[in-house]
Regions:
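Short alpha-helical segments that sit at the start of domains
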Residues: 1-23
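Short capping segments at the starts of secondary-structure elements
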Residues: 14, 27-33
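Basic amphipathic alpha-helical segments that dock to polyanions
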Residues: 52-62
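Short amphipathic alpha-helical elements of helix-turn-helix/winged-helix folds
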Residues: 20-28, 40, 62
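Short acidic, hydrophobic short linear motifs in intrinsically disordered regions
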Residues: 31-41
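Short coil turns linking two alpha-helices in DNA-binding domains
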Residues: 48-49
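Non-DNA-binding regulatory cores of transcription-related proteins
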Residues: 66-67, 71, 75-137
Length: 137
């Protein structure tokens, strides 16, 4: 998957499969697994895992969605000013995922790369937390 993550102001041409996968993710408001997407969209004509994975890969490449690696799920990108790489919090109790953007965090990663003469092709930061609701209960 590509590390490019930009939102174009121009509407990019999406295939039918990409549009229906994107619509499902937008309407869900939560991370979805590929096989759940396949099951949910069979009536729309998506009949094979390959169709779903191709659509998901392209949507990630276009910066429309993110893959949450640790839970092997996909979520809509909610950050209109998103950078190349993004971080998430995942509640250990309820499973709620939140996209976060923090300049200090990304600056720290940039410093790490520079100090160690590395070239990051992409990164995916996932923090396991107790969300506000679960912390109270």
């Amino acid at each position: 998957m590509s590390s490019t993550h930009t939102h174009s102001k121009k509407s990019q041409s999406l295939t039918k499969n990409q549009r229906i996968v994107l619509d499902l993710l937008q309407n869900s408001g939560e991370p979805l697994k590929a096989y759940f997407i396949l099951y949910s969209l069979k009536k729309e004509g998506l009949n094979s895992p390959l169709q779903v994975y191709r659509a998901l890969d392209k949507l990630v490449e276009l910066g429309k969605i993110h893959k949450i690696e640790s839970i092997n799920s996909f979520i809509i990108c909610n950050n209109s000013n998103c950078a190349k790489n993004t971080a998430f919090t995942i509640c250990e109790r309820c499973g709620k995922v939140k996209e976060i953007k923090n300049r200090d965090l990304t600056g720290g990663v940039s410093d790490l790369v520079k100090d160690n003469q590395l070239e990051i092709t992409r990164y995916n930061l996932e923090f396991y937390v107790l969300c506000k609701s679960c912390k109270i209960n």
